[in-house]
A protein has these predicted regions:
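A conserved helix-loop-beta module that forms one wall/lid of the active-site cleft
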Residues: 1-22, 29
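ATP-dependent carboxylate activation and anion-phosphoryl transfer catalytic cores
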Residues: 21, 26, 33-266
Length: 266
């Protein structure tokens, strides 16, 4: 609520900046500010929206990148001081700031930048004593990573990391919660091929609004390198009370092209 401090921070970051609700998520509670003249009013509006939506008016400022990619790092850590990364994922394909397609590893990332950020994420887990599965999210532009946040939970897109490393993230999460050490070391985590996940949503394709109702026929795809995570079945009624995602289709291949082709066929 300190106007002068907010202006100073924004000037130091450099316009454009983005005002974000600290308690926000799913693409809500964000406002881009291109000029200094609009900063204070944008902060006030975002605070009001955040208070109404999340019960918390706290906001913060970040540098707004014009053409970034969304790249994140999957980590696992236990109570014995061990931590590993399961490489990275690209989640750039979104609508309304919500992910719809994810892949691992993230294509076209500078190798040196990747190595540095993977090591930094593992070091951060050890330094803070983190336990469980987690994801460090970044924006990536022009060979540089910009930290967004850490999600201290399992994410929807975790299967692509499982497919390219062979590590069962859910099993490890439950095991370390019970006090056991990780069953893998960093040397055990070997990148194998490429994986892609498509989120299947019960939505109107024109408006992207949720479309609850009866699923008359459901025939999931199968075959080599194809995985389906879902709870639905023929005759299932999609309720109107929850998120519209009803399934995840994941494909794995020796190369990105093979994973894409298998997804296209699926």
């Amino acid at each position: 609520n300190d106007d002068e401090k907010n202006l100073t921070i924004a000037r130091d970051i450099g316009f454009p900046v983005i005002v974000k609700a600290a308690a926000g998520g799913g693409g809500r509670g964000m406002r881009v500010v291109h000029t200094e003249a609009n900063l204070l009013s944008s902060i006030q509006i975002t605070q009001s929206e955040a208070k109404a939506a999340f019960g918390d008016a706290t906001v913060y400022l970040e540098k707004f990148l014009e053409k970034p990619r969304h790249v994140e790092v999957q980590v696992l850590a236990d109570k014995h001081g061990n931590a590993v990364h399961l490489y990275d994922r690209d989640c750039s394909l979104q609508r309304r700031h919500q992910k719809v397609l994810e892949e691992a590893p993230a294509p076209g990332v500078d190798p040196d930048a990747r190595a540095q950020v993977l090591e930094a994420c593992v070091t951060a887990c050890k330094n803070m004593g983190y336990v469980g599965a987690g994801t460090f999210e970044f924006l990536y532009e022009d060979g540089r990573f910009y930290f967004i946040e850490m999600n201290t939970r399992v994410q929807v897109e975790h299967p692509v990391s499982e497919m390219v490393t062979g590590v069962d993230i859910i099993r490890e999460q439950i095991s370390v919660a019970a006090g056991n050490p990780l069953s893998v070391t960093q040397d055990d985590v070997v990148l194998n091929g490429h994986a892609i996940e498509c989120r299947i949503n019960a939505e109107n394709p024109d408006t992207f609004l949720p479309s609850p109702g009866l699923i008359e026929r459901y025939h999931p795809p199968g075959g080599p390198g194809v995985r389906v995570d879902s709870h639905i079945y023929s005759g299932y009624s999609v309720p109107p009370h929850y998120d519209s995602m009803i399934a995840k289709f994941i494909t794995h291949g020796a190369t990105r092209d093979e994973a894409l082709k298998r997804m296209e066929i699926a």
